[in-house]
Regions:
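Catalytic core of nucleotide-sugar-dependent glycosyltransferases
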Residues: 82-106
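Short, small-residue-biased leader/transition segments that mark boundaries at the very start
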Residues: 2-5
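Short acidic/polar alpha-helix capping motifs at helix-coil junctions
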Residues: 15-19, 81
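Active-site donor/metal-binding and catalytic loop motifs
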Residues: 65-82
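A short, conserved alpha-helix in the catalytic core of glycosyltransferases
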Residues: 18-35, 42-61, 66-67
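A generic structural signal for short coil/turn motifs at secondary-structure boundaries
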Residues: 40-42, 81
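Short, P/G- and charge-enriched loop/turn segments at secondary-structure junctions
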Residues: 9-15
Length: 112
């Protein structure tokens, strides 16, 4: 017998709020098309939201995995939040400009 996933899993498919990358799956080709994470983010905050916003802006949709997938979290020191004001401005820029691709991402590391 299978366990059906709730219908709410498919709600808010274009909502970036609440999406976090502690347990995010994305197709490699889709990640490459938006050039991965924006490397302009430093310290704590908003780089995962920026990634999700650009995926949504490029036509991809979310599926909620809550209560359906396991989470394994590696302990790490919490990042410095001193730059969060700069990071939130980067995020606002991605939202306002409907950004899909970052200039500072995967391709800066020599991947094709």
């Amino acid at each position: 017998q299978t366990c059906a996933l709730p219908i709410w899993r498919y709600k808010n498919r274009e909502k970036w709020e609440g999406a976090i990358t502690c347990n995010l799956a994305v197709w490699r080709d889709d990640l490459y098309k938006i050039n991965g994470f924006n490397q302009q983010y430093h310290g704590w905050g908003y780089e995962d939201s920026d990634l999700v916003i650009r995926l949504i802006n490029s036509g991809k949709h979310r599926k909620e995995g809550r209560y359906a997938v396991g989470v394994i979290h590696l302990w790490h020191k919490e990042n410095d939040r001193n730059l969060s004001d700069i990071n939130i401005n980067l995020l606002k820029n991605s939202i306002q400009n409907k950004t899909t691709i970052t200039n500072t991402g995967i391709k800066n590391y020599g991947t094709d």
